[in-house]
């Protein structure tokens, strides 16, 4: 099993996901809301992606079926946890880690389940982020 190749692909996935967080940042600018939570989330996810990718960027071996299955499993867990960061950083939600990961995993799996009691009161960039997770997952 080539763990370096798996780590490299995980880094690429995180780098791509971090770029999608720029969309809610743009929405926050448009609506005049704070970008701090999303900007911090972007930076965390982007730099973790860089840390996973760059040490392994010269790895060129073929991915076998076993590694492909592991990459898909890691994909779901990693994106669910890193997708929870904006929910954790939003002070209006007061989410625990479990609630934030549940909300993120719900978006990635497009189940539509939520722990938010009044979705209409969320700020617009966070609403956009929730829908973006569902779009990316679907």
Enumerate the predicted regions with their spans.
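Membrane-proximal intracellular helices of multi-pass ion channels
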Residues: 1-138
């Amino acid at each position: 099993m080539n763990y370096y190749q798996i780590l490299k692909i995980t880094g690429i996935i995180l780098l791509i996901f971090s770029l999608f967080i720029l969309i809610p940042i743009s929405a926050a600018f448009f609506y005049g809301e704070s970008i701090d939570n999303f900007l911090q989330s972007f930076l965390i996810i982007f730099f973790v992606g860089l840390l996973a990718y760059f040490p392994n960027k010269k790895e060129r071996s073929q991915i076998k079926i076993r590694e492909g299955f592991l990459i898909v499993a890691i994909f779901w867990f990693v994106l669910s946890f890193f997708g929870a960061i904006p929910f954790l950083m939003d002070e209006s939600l007061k989410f625990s880690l479990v609630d934030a990961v549940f909300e993120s995993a719900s978006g990635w799996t497009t189940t539509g389940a939520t722990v938010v009691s009044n979705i209409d009161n969320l700020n617009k960039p966070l609403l956009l982020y929730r829908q973006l997770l569902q779009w990316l997952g679907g």
